[in-house]
């Protein structure tokens, strides 16, 4: 089964199966995994990287996805490629002679998912090829909010008009249309947390549970979710101040950005995340 994800940003690991170069790995960033592996195996003239050109075939073994934007994903890619240069990973031991490049970079990945800023992001670690799967060290398991997934993933573009719809809030859309009819241009939305007027729709979040009309400033809702952990900048989850349902921060951001394809599945199983608010630092 292929899982489709809207607003896709991922960082992947390739494994070389060419007998001449077998065991070599490559780490890269993509917004379209299916297209990217074809480019790598097609060579430079097909858009592949020069480091992988002429050394295929390559298998795309695993991918980390759920980044809020390309900048966050690219910074993650760089740190994974250069663990001993990144100030976030100075504690990671260097590769031993007995370690394969694949096992070493998997170990680096385990460390990365447990340190700031990445340990607060709503990431998914997905094994794309079952035959390469490794058991992660017991003491280096990802945070509980980061699921381990299996199987292929496909990037799906956000449909036109859905992004605007998401920022307004699906439940608020019909209500606001009625307000426009009744009040003309005098449509006023107030934050459910601070009760101040919401001036900019780009600065607001909306609950996606049916019947809930929550509107709140991003910062107000973030601070509410972080009341018990003020040392952090990025919330993981919290209770909707309007309907009382548990909300994953990443789901709220994906909903705001117009991603609806996997929200129904997420809200019921809590198996996938999406996040924003704070741009990752390297």
Swiss-Prot record:
Zinc finger (SLX1-type): 191-243
Pfam family, one: SLX1_C
The protein's enzyme class: hydrolase
An annotated Gene Ontology molecular function: crossover junction DNA endonuclease activity
Keywords: DNA damage, DNA recombination, DNA repair, Endonuclease, Hydrolase, Metal-binding, Nuclease, Nucleus, Zinc, Zinc-finger
GO biological process: double-strand break repair via homologous recombination
Name of this protein: Structure-specific endonuclease subunit slx1
Originating gene: slx1a
